[in-house]
Design a protein with these regions (language model features):
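Active-site catalytic motif of lipid deacylating hydrolases and related acyltransferases
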Residues: 2-57
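Glycine-rich His-Gly loop
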Residues: 7-11, 65-66, 89, 174
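Active-site signature of alpha/beta-hydrolase-fold catalytic machinery across serine-
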Residues: 19, 74-78
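Gly/Ala-rich beta-loop-alpha elbow adjacent to hydrolase catalytic centers
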Residues: 63-72
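Flexible "cap/lid" loop of the alpha/beta hydrolase fold
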Residues: 77-120, 153-159, 182, 186
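Conserved alpha/beta-hydrolase catalytic His-Asp/Glu region
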Residues: 118-163
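Conserved serine/cysteine hydrolase catalytic core
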Residues: 147-207, 211, 220
Length: 221
């Protein structure tokens, strides 16, 4: 039995993965969803991801979404994960350190931080984020689970383990939000799949996203 550990972005929290977790469990998989509540540094977030991995036998697959993709290779090395399925996620550099936000995003975030250097909740970064959610109730659930991270989090850098791109990996993209990362995954020879949708498509169609994760997991086994 495959064991999935779903890694949410520290910006939006575990609520973004709960519908997919329910679908995967209904299909007979073992599923854990990491919580990054209270985490404000990359080290704390990585530790929370590692702590979410339950003991047990069987193939284990990490499933990072969005910003969690930067840390997934380090988590996989720490827990001995069998593979990683990146879901509309950022990817670190193949070698050397990677800042936890691209330079153009850092410039944008610098203008959002308050006098203490703390950013507003993620859904307040944008003029209109309503299209990201299927309904008001789902939006409220996600907003209740959001954390406010310091700007310093995104100015930090992570250094993935040497040779991390050789670990069995797949990439599930939602539309073209992470088009460059998708192209990179293809160039690395990873199996890929694209579902048309926004960045939180797992909230709109958890069954399709769960099916995509399951398919890619079987292709990297």
């Amino acid at each position: 039995m495959t064991r999935y550990v779903l890694l949410p972005s520290p910006l939006v929290g575990a609520a973004t993965w709960r519908p997919v977790a329910e679908v995967l469990r209904a299909g007979g998989a073992s599923v854990a969803v990491a919580s990054t509540d209270g985490c404000t540094t990359p080290e704390q977030v990585q530790a929370a991801y590692v702590a979410a991995v339950p003991p047990g036998d069987g193939a284990m697959v990490l499933v990072p979404h969005s910003n969690a993709g930067y840390l997934a290779a380090n988590v996989a090395a720490a827990v001995g994960s069998a593979g990683v399925v990146y879901v509309d996620a950022a990817l670190p550099a193949s070698t050397g350190p990677t800042t936890l936000a691209p330079s153009e995003l850092l410039d944008f975030l610098a203008g959002l931080a308050d006098e203490d250097g703390v950013l507003p909740p993620w859904t307040q970064w944008w003029d209109d984020s309503d299209g990201l959610f299927p309904d008001d109730a789902t939006r409220a659930e996600v907003e209740a689970d959001q954390s406010r991270l310091p700007l310093a989090y995104f100015r930090s850098a992570v250094r993935p383990p040497t040779g991390w791109t050789a670990r069995p990996s797949g990439y599930l993209a939602f539309g073209d939000t992470y088009a460059e990362e998708l192209e990179r995954a293809i160039s690395l020879g990873w199996p890929t799949r694209v579902l048309e949708g926004g960045h939180l498509h797992q909230l709109h169609d958890p069954a399709a996203v769960a099916a995509g994760i399951t398919e890619l997991s079987s292709r990297i086994a």
